[in-house]
């Protein structure tokens, strides 16, 4: 029985030939992402901007999100978000912080509850103040930075320094483009978005390490081969695995977008974008960087000798 293959084996695609196009293209996208972040900004959710969240459940039938949105907007409590989640009877109503402090915020909560009426059960009320939201921003940013530094320190000691630099540049490229994606699409940026960014970083580094490990293996084997040709051979060797992995994860994320509800929609869409960007950067950003950093086959550590790798004979 033949195994399922999404890419042909023994391909000879000249990936490194496109490095003169991929680098300017990626630099342009990175600049656009930074400009979007600085000028447009992120659509911070209640976790980071502060405000009130009401989790409701319709007592009879399906929740009418359009009617709930109209009721909340009529009360003039600021920006209102109404999202379904879980079952058809469940809905979340969000609105921002009110001028006047805690007293004004609680008064707005009471007005919304009274306007909704007895048709809905209020299952949860959550108020996030500006101080708490600021602490969440700092904690989330610190968590992302620490995780990236820890993994990149591992790469620095695990591989040659050129490999670590290439991985750092590819990871920062993926982070910038993901931030730009959030700013452009206006997806709500909340704590699940932080989880998405950390997952994208992990996926990107995993794809990068797989490619770098194959490149190092080939450099030990073919020390005299030109670096660009050797990297092409290495990337072509792992491309079937890369396509299979990305496709599998992509199909799972499509299911989350279709059936997961609004609560994890931003996470799922960000992950889809991140998988695409991470796959691209591992091939067209990290690998060509080794050429520009002057990595050659004779600079890579020697492979283990056959005597060292041959298993010892056991006595009968």
PLM-predicted stretches and their roles:
Residues 1-316:
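A structural signal for conserved, well-ordered secondary-structure elements
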């Amino acid at each position: 029985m033949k195994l399922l293959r999404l890419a042909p084996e023994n391909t000879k695609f000249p990936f490194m030939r496109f490095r003169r196009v991929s680098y300017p293209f990626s630099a342009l996208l990175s600049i656009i992402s930074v400009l979007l972040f600085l000028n447009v900004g992120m659509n911070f959710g209640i976790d980071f901007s502060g405000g009130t969240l009401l989790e409701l459940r319709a007592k009879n039938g399906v929740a009418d999100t359009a009617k709930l949105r109209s009721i909340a907007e009529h009360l003039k409590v600021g920006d209102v978000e109404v999202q379904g989640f879980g079952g058809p009877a469940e809905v979340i109503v969000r609105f921002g912080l009110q001028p006047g402090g805690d007293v004004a915020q609680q008064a707005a909560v009471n007005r919304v509850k009274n306007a909704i009426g007895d048709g809905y059960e209020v299952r949860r009320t959550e108020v996030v103040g500006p101080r708490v939201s600021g602490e969440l921003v700092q904690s989330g940013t610190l968590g992302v930075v620490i995780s990236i530094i820890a993994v990149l320190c591992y790469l620095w000691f695990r591989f040659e320094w050129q490999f670590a630099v290439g991985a750092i540049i590819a990871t920062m490229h993926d982070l910038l483009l993901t931030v730009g994606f959030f700013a452009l699409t206006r997806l709500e940026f909340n704590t699940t978005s932080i989880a998405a960014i950390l997952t994208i970083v992990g996926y990107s580094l995993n794809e990068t390490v797989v490619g770098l490990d194959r490149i190092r293996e080939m450099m030990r084997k073919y020390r005299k081969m030109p670096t660009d040709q050797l990297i092409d051979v290495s990337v072509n060797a792992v491309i079937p695995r890369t396509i299979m992995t990305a496709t599998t994860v992509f199909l799972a994320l499509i299911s989350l977008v279709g059936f997961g509800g609004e609560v994890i929609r931003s996470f799922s869409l960000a992950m889809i974008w991140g998988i695409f960007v991470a796959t691209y950067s591992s091939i067209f950003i990290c690998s060509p960087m080794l050429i520009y950093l002057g990595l050659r086959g004779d600079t890579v550590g020697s492979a283990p000798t056959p005597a060292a790798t041959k298993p010892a004979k056991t006595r009968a």
